[in-house]
From Swiss-Prot:
The keyword tRNA processing applies. The active site is at 103 (nucleophile), 200 (cysteine persulfide intermediate). Disulfide bonds join 103-200. Residues 150-152, 312-313 are annotated as: Interaction with tRNA. The lineage of its organism: Bacteria, Bacillati, Bacillota, Bacilli, Lactobacillales. NCBIfam families: PRK00143.1, trmU. It catalyses: S-sulfanyl-L-cysteinyl-[protein] + uridine(34) in tRNA + AH2 + ATP = 2-thiouridine(34) in tRNA + L-cysteinyl-[protein] + A + AMP + diphosphate + H(+). This is tRNA-specific 2-thiouridylase MnmA. The record marks 128, 344 as: Interaction with tRNA. Belongs to the MnmA/TRMU family. One of its GO terms (molecular function) is tRNA-uridine 2-sulfurtransferase activity. Catalyzes the 2-thiolation of uridine at the wobble position (U34) of tRNA, leading to the formation of s(2)U34.
Length: 373
């Protein structure tokens, strides 16, 4: 039997049930476990309560229960510089960013990993639903979590081989329901705590209200692609491609009673384009360009391959052909795709393995850009 007592694992503990069970399982497996709470955002809720303080209390309670030391580390500056500035720049450019992908790459598996090394860590661990598997050459492959509904490899797709070599995902083989059961059986303080939602480390604030604190909204015209004026929009940054709600126009404007959707943006003229029908022609595309292309292991500078891909979290995989040229790629779809959104991640899979991915720059229909951006 392996003696894990000399292997130190530093666990990123958020105060939620997933990271609590992560620490518990590692402790039960005999590892030398240390818990670390990351404070990445200066946050208070509508009642003036600092939610980070409440979460840290939960971390302390769980760490005391399972008998591990714990620390708090402040990454507010790193988060602002490496994640939040990027987040704002993307919205200024009319795109819809995915800050969770950048947060994992820059904070949880860079700033936190570096800090863990100063504590003498051999590995870091988090409560993500993903799996790592070593091959005979010592290379680490990242596999989807066993719970399809919770798999988080989409958000981990920018991690490097070096980061994965130092990472453990103890929940990867479990269903979420099993994680709750483990927490309840152990009587953990977080066993019944609800899952957090919302933007990475910003929580459940009203998004429109939150964004307006940092970016001035500029109202403009809402139009159909054939030039019909449909009224005023509140600011392009508040809308994403394929969005249905919040437009303030109903079926009465159309004649066929189909709902209205955002189909494009023109940043230079501050126009929001809308169209009727879930599969409106302006929402459909057959390829995309992506940048910041990254693979979890070494790949050639230029190559072409077939795989499946996700263009947003929680969507079925689609078959694609990928033409890689350095850190850029053209991704050609086997079937037309709906609402491909600049700023979101495209993530590549080979069966259960997550190969990596990139950030969507533009969608194309028959070679023509189709987002009006």
């Amino acid at each position: 039997m392996t003696d894990n007592s000399k292997i130190r694992v530093v666990v990123g503990m958020s105060g939620g049930v997933d990271s609590s069970v992560t620490a518990l399982l590692l402790k039960e497996q005999g590892y030398d476990v240390i818990g670390v709470f990351m404070k990445n955002w200066d946050d208070t809720d509508e009642f003036g309560v600092c939610t980070a303080t409440e979460d840290y209390k939960d971390v302390a309670a769980v760490a005391d229960q399972i008998g591990i030391p714990y620390y708090s580390v402040n990454f507010e500056k790193e988060y602002w510089d490496r994640v939040f500035e990027y987040f704002l720049a993307e919205y200024r450019a009319g795109r819809t960013p995915n800050p969770d992908v950048m947060c994992n790459k820059e904070i949880k598996f860079k700033a936190f990993l570096d800090y863990a090394m100063t504590l003498g860590a051999d590995y870091v661990a988090t409560g993500h639903y993903a799996q790592v598997k070593r091959d005979e050459n010592g290379k680490v492959h990242m596999l989807r979590g066993a719970d399809n509904g919770k798999d988080q490899t989409y958000f981990l797709s920018q991690l490097s081989q070096e980061q994965l070599q130092k990472t453990l995902f103890p929940l990867g083989h479990l269903q979420k329901s099993e994680v709750r059961e483990i927490a309840e059986r152990a009587g953990l303080a977080t066993a019944k705590k609800k899952d957090s939602t919302g933007i990475c480390f910003i929580g459940e604030k009203n998004f429109k209200q939150f964004l307006s604190q940092y970016l001035p909204a500029q109202k403009g015209r809402m139009m159909t692609i054939d030039g019909r004026d449909m009224g005023e929009h509140a600011g392009l940054m508040y809308y994403t491609i394929g969005q249905r709600g919040g437009l303030g126009i109903g079926g009465q404007h159309g004649g066929d009673n189909q709902p209205w959707f955002v189909v494009g943006k023109d940043l230079s003229q501050n126009i929001l384009y809308v169209g009727q029908g879930f599969y409106h022609e302006a929402l459909m595309s057959n390829s995309l360009d992506a940048s910041v292309i990254h693979f979890t292991r070494e790949m050639p500078e230029e190559f072409t391959f077939e795989c499946t891909a996700k263009f947003r979290y929680r969507q079925p995989d689609s078959h694609v052909t990928v033409h890689v040229r350095g850190d850029k790629a053209e991704v050609v779809f086997a079937e037309p795709q709906r609402a491909i959104t600049p700023g979101q991640a495209v993530v590549f899979y080979d069966g259960k393995e997550c190969l990596g991915g990139g950030m969507i720059d533009m969608a194309y229909k028959n070679g023509q850009p189709c987002q009006y951006i």
